[in-house]
């Protein structure tokens, strides 16, 4: 059994050793909740990695969106190359849940596009938890949605070893039962093929490696792993576990039992609808449910089988669904990253799901058991936590109330200080800001401006563009890929000024930013709360020459608290630097930037120099193209699609220029 072991040239510095010791001691003392209050750029991820290494517990890291989850996953893979680090997020590229709008009598069918690569990673995560303890899973809030019963999942897992007495047809039957399909032509993930005495399987948790079971009569002679693309043998296996192709797979016995319960619930519900004189709804429900029952009986599943998950699990009405949290051992450790954002997100999930399901049940599209295919309520989520570390620069009341220990991490390894904050009057703020922008850009730095409304962001962008400032705006209407493109352009200097609303809070750690301007800072509200202001101020904490300007006529409570907190941290940081003779230095290229797209900008910046280096060393262009193509495939494999696209463009340019 592997142990967590960090591979890094860095050692904990600054506040990190004290924070690590404090939190590890608290966890070992059996405390349920603790908080890591770490400022931007203080190396919170490295602290988390050290806590995992010291406590040796299976770990779940909860992030508030897919992008940050992917970034954290990549960082932890670097820290723990010899351990299992998995990525668990929603596998939908596009998802339209089924819904009914009574006002217009409109039923919207469920429509979804599933990302096969992410589905594979989800299976890889759950199967890893069944096999090992040295497992870290980085997940989005998707992990609080129903996932199927882990006990049934374990029970249906097929365990095979050389020398076992197993009939080939018996193994095939079991594979079909756990929703694998036979396909001798299009051999893909979740399928198997038969070639003489050999049975080839591509497990649900892999797409590049297959398992070959070689039979001799009724005995398993040998088990080998092979490359799906080339067919080359990779190695011998002494044991293999084939996990179900679906998290909602169930045994024949469970399905038969479930069908009887579904039929009973249908009968009860039809009586209720008929008594209420809802003849159309009763007819609709009968037709739809009987069709689902027939599909389950014949195929072992039906479209929307998750709506019957409570019955398949054998749970009572109203009980919480089984989720990824139930796949972890009882002593697992959880980190909630950016907890001030993630926890409210977890809290909001249940209500939205319930209101949509109510219409579906009332109007005969679903049985009441559909209510129990849902995310966890917040109280249920709390009850499933064993031990948790809340991680945030601005922890909320909940985190502080539920923590026995709060460990502060204020010192940055780079010696960088929290920025200087200036307060200037609102009158003439735009003209004053224009002067500051010019001075900042002339020094080769960038500017972030936060406004209160989308309209103001757009108007200010237009105004600055008319003054020949390279400005652009970013708000909620801009999709993720466009957002990444804008950040890349900002880092490259194609854009000097980025204007936004609250999108400028978490996840925009850009070292080139030397000025953050907060317009209308005294308009108290959620965009100008203490938490929002501290997070926004933090965007200027990656550059040694940065400052923050708040435009305000009054000093609100939130402003006062955020300014005092920033000043408190700044004093601690300056004293530490003086004591240890540290000069603050701008991080030009951190361990890894939070937004994945920023890595692409570094690729583009280095592109010309790479080509020049290659020319000096007499490396042929063909060789360089080959190298970039390998990197592109690796990036796509690691879900770094923006980086892969950038490399693709570089390859295209190289090919055109070499003609």
From Swiss-Prot:
What SUPFAM superfamilies does the database record attribute to this sequence?
A: C-terminal UvrC-binding domain of UvrB (SSF46600), P-loop containing nucleoside triphosphate hydrolases (SSF52540)
An example GO CC term for this entry is: cytoplasm
Note on domains (UniProt) = The beta-hairpin motif is involved in DNA binding.
Name of the featured protein? UvrABC system protein B
**Motif Beta-hairpin per UniProt: ranges:** 91-114
Q: Which GO terms describe its molecular function?
A: ATP binding; ATP hydrolysis activity; DNA binding; excinuclease ABC activity
Cytoplasm found in the keyword field:
yes
**Function field:** The UvrABC repair system catalyzes the recognition and processing of DNA lesions. A damage recognition complex composed of 2 UvrA and 2 UvrB subunits scans DNA for abnormalities. Upon binding of the UvrA(2)B(2) complex to a putative damaged site, the DNA wraps around one UvrB monomer. DNA wrap is dependent on ATP binding by UvrB and probably causes local melting of the DNA helix, facilitating insertion of UvrB beta-hairpin between the DNA strands. Then UvrB probes one DNA strand for the presence of a lesion.
The alphabetized UniProt keywords are: ATP-binding, Cytoplasm, DNA damage, DNA excision, DNA repair, Excision nuclease, Nucleotide-binding, SOS response
Q: Where is the Helicase ATP-binding domain?
A: 25-412
Residues involved in ATP binding: 38-45
Q: Which residues form the UVR domain?
A: 622-657
Query: Helicase C-terminal domain: from which residue to which, for each copy?
Result: 429-582
Q: Which gene encodes it?
A: uvrB
Species, as recorded: Clostridium perfringens (strain 13 / Type A)
Q: Which family does it belong to?
A: Belongs to the UvrB family.
Which processes are annotated in GO (biological process)? Answer: nucleotide-excision repair; SOS response
């Amino acid at each position: 059994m592997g142990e967590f072991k960090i591979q890094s040239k860095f050692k904990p510095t600054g506040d990190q050793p004290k924070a690590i010791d404090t939190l590890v001691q608290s966890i070992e003392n059996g405390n349920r909740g603790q908080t890591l209050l770490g400022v931007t750029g203080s190396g919170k991820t490295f602290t988390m990695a050290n806590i995992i290494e010291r406590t040796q517990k299976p770990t779940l890291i909860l992030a508030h969106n897919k992008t940050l989850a992917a970034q954290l996953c990549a960082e932890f893979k670097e820290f723990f190359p010899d351990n299992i680090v998995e990525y668990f997020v929603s596998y939908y590229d596009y998802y339209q849940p089924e819904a009914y709008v009574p006002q217009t009598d409109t039923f919207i069918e469920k429509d979804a596009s599933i990302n096969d690569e992410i589905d594979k990673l989800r299976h890889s995560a759950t199967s890893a938890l069944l096999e090992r303890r040295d497992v870290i899973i980085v997940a989005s809030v998707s992990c609080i949605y129903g996932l199927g019963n882990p006990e049934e999942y374990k029970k249906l897992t097929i365990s095979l070893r050389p020398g076992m007495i197993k009939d080939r047809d018996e193994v095939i039957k079991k594979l079909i039962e756990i929703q694998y399909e036979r396909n001798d032509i299009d051999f893909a993930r979740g399928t198997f093929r038969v070639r003489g005495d050999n049975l080839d399987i591509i497990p649900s948790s892999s797409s590049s490696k297959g398992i070959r079971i070689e039979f001799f009569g009724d005995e398993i002679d040998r088990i080998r792993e092979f490359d799906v693309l080339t067919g080359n043998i990779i190695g011998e296996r002494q044991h293999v576990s084939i996990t179900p192709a679906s998290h909602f797979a169930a045994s024949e016995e469970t399905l038969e039992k479930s069908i009887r319960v579904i039929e009973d619930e249908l009968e009860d519900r039809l009586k209720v609808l008929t008594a209420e004189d809802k003849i159309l709804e009763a007819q609709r429900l009968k037709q739809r449910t009987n069709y689902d029952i027939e599909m389950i009986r014949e195929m072992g599943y039906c479209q929307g089988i998750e709506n019957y998950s409570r019955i398949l699990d054998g749970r009572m009405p109203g009980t919480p669904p089984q989720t990824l949290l139930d796949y972890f051992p009882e002593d697992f450790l959880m980190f909630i990253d950016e907890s001030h954002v993630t926890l409210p997100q977890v809290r909001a999930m249940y209500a939205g799901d319930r209101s949509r399901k109510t219409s579906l049940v009332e109007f005969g599209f679903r049985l009441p058991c559909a209510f129990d295919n849902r995310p966890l309520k917040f109280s249920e989520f709390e009850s499933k936590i064993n031990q948790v570390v809340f991680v945030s620069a601005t922890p909320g009341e909940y985190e502080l109330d539920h923590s026995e220990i709060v460990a502060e991490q204020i010192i940055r390894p780079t010696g960088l200080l929290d920025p200087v904050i200036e307060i200037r009057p609102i009158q003439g703020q735009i003209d004053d800001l224009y002067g500051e922008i010019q001075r900042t850009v002339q020094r080769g730095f960038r500017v972030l401006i936060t406004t209160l409304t989308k309209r103001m962001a757009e108007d200010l962008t237009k105004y600055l563009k008319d003054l020949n400032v390279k400005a652009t705006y970013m708000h909620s209407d801009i999709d993720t890929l466009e957002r990444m493109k804008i950040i890349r352009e900002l880092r490259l200097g194609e854009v000097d000024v980025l204007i936004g609303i609250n999108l400028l809070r978490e996840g925009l750690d850009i070292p080139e930013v030397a000025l953050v301007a907060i317009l209308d800072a005294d308009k108290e509200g959620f965009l100008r709360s203490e938490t929002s202001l501290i997070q926004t101020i933090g965007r200027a904490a990656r550059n040694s020459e940065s400052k923050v300007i708040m435009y305000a006529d009054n000093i609100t409570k939130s402003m006062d608290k955020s300014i005092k907190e920033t000043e408190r941290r700044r004093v601690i940081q300056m004293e530490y630097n003086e004591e240890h003779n540290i000069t603050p230095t701008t991080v030009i290229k951190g361990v890894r930037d939070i937004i994945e797209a920023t890595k692409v900008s570094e690729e583009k910046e280095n592109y010309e120099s790479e080509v020049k280096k290659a020319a000096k060393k007499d490396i042929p262009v063909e060789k360089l193209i080959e190298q970039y193509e390998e990197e592109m495939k690796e990036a796509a494999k690691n879900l770094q699609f923006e980086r892969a696209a950038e490399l693709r463009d570089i390859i295209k340019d190289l090919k055109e220029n070499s003609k």
